[in-house]
Amino acid sequence: MLACDVDEAPRAVDDLDEVGARELEANGFRLNGTRFNGFRLNGFRLNGFRLDGDENSGNYVDLESFTLGQGGPVTHAWLAGSELRAKNGSGTVFGGAQLVGAVLSFGLVDNGDNVYRNRRLRIANVTRLAPGSEVWLYDLEVKDAVGVWQPLCDGPNGPTQAILVGAVWDPTTGSRVAAVSDAVTAACRDAAIGKCVEWGYHPWKLADYHQTCTRLVRADYCGDGIPHTTDNVMIHVVDEIGVQVPEPDASYAVEAEWDPNGATCLNAEHTRLPAPDIACVLPSCGEAFDSGGLIQTGVPAP
């Protein structure tokens, strides 16, 4: 598969098409892209919230209430893959488009003045990535300081949707934080976490491959959270499990192989940007996947 650094979300594909050769995909340098990025979320964790966690947990947004558009308050909520499900007091379970209109209220500390404030997040629409897909897309809106609902995911090319992922990432290192059963990230489609789900690396099934993908999308060679790419840089992506397979007519030079901690090997003459300032020493790549990497990237041959 060839991939390209673009800001807009990739085309929606059917689950059957998610496995196989594709021409162009998006890769970029942002780990996630929500309007929350200007906030310090309870100190140091970015984008994570807990569906049923204790308040004032320190590492996550405090979810204070979850109310359905029709169906009343939620007593229990969880993710099934990327689908949010919620149970009300009568025991009825809601999911998919039934959650349109639901509002989540939570507390956070605003970076601007260190004041703890209540914020509200609304589910404006819910669709599948494609008919029959197990990937769900959420149009999420956050109410701003003057009471206007604004898109949560507002990328360079305009608002986009989010994919809900049952994990939390450290915004500095890009590492996936140790699993917490009820932790959720609203991953915008135009940034690495969401893109990798769309590429077929579903973290509820392929956690290590998904984390590996978030490294390679951002050219985070050393696994330290520092990206070495820009938008609109084309790359080729392939793995050995058949999620992304070589495009038959693609001509490319191997850039690197990757695991969840960054690159396992790197061909310095084939990096996406010329002579990047890399803080680690990596061996050159030999035969395909001899380095122990899970996914391989390449750049178009000159």
How would you label these PLM feature ranges?
Residues L2-A3:
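C-terminal motif of bacterial Sec signal peptides marking the signal peptidase cleavage site
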